[in-house]
Amino acid sequence: MERLEGKTVLVTGAARRIGRAIALGLHAEGARVLLHYGTSEEEAREVSELCGGAPLYRANLESAGEIREMFARIGREQGGLYGLVNNAARFTRAPVLEISEADWDFIHSVNLKAVFFCAQEAARLMGRGGGGRIVNISSMGAFLAWPEHVHYCASKAGVVALTRGLAKALAPRISVNSVAPGVIPFEEREDPAIQKMARSTPAGRPGTGEEIADAVVFFLKASPFVTGQVLQVDGGLGLR
């Protein structure tokens, strides 16, 4: 397996929750972590300090133009890129008959559109160094029917399809894989329905951000022969 020491990896949505755990996990592996954030500047600065002063990159991922500008800056300042972790995402609940066009666009603009344009720009930078690794964070919602999260589930199913398509399009120099987390609570007062879902898994508990980070590290270190794959880190949730 590859070593991550000294390799430059960008994590989107790195200020909080799973993104924070991924950034810290990559820093522990010796990677040169780049931290993207949207609005959570204070939290992003805290993660930066924990990652040895990791560079911060702010961008509104709803805008392909801002994504291009962010990667152009990375190219100027870092010279290249080894890895991209497309983690930034939005999650909302709404009955299916109440989902508006604005609700749909709010989710898909970040959960799917931004994943594509970040991967596109990252691939350009990775080409300078002979290749790289892209890891997209999907969700078990891509595979399970969650009736009050239809717009979210559709976006994450799109991430799975996008991962497979990109894996073919960018081979053999760039591998593209996905991690699909199960129940990973971060709020002190988590939704009772989510708590119940976590208890019903074969693992009998929710997962942790660190467990998702471990899966991301695996794909970033894996041989480029591993590509187009989706690793479900869900405590067996998908077996129900």
Language-model regions, residue ranges each:
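Alpha-helical segment proximal to the catalytic Tyr-Lys
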Residues: 124, 168-172
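Short, small/polar-rich loop/turn modules that mediate ligand/substrate recognition or access, typified
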Residues: 171-175, 227-228
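Active-site helix of classical SDR
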Residues: 119, 155, 163
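Substrate-binding pocket helix/loop in short-chain dehydrogenase/reductase
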Residues: 95-96, 103-108, 134, 189, ...
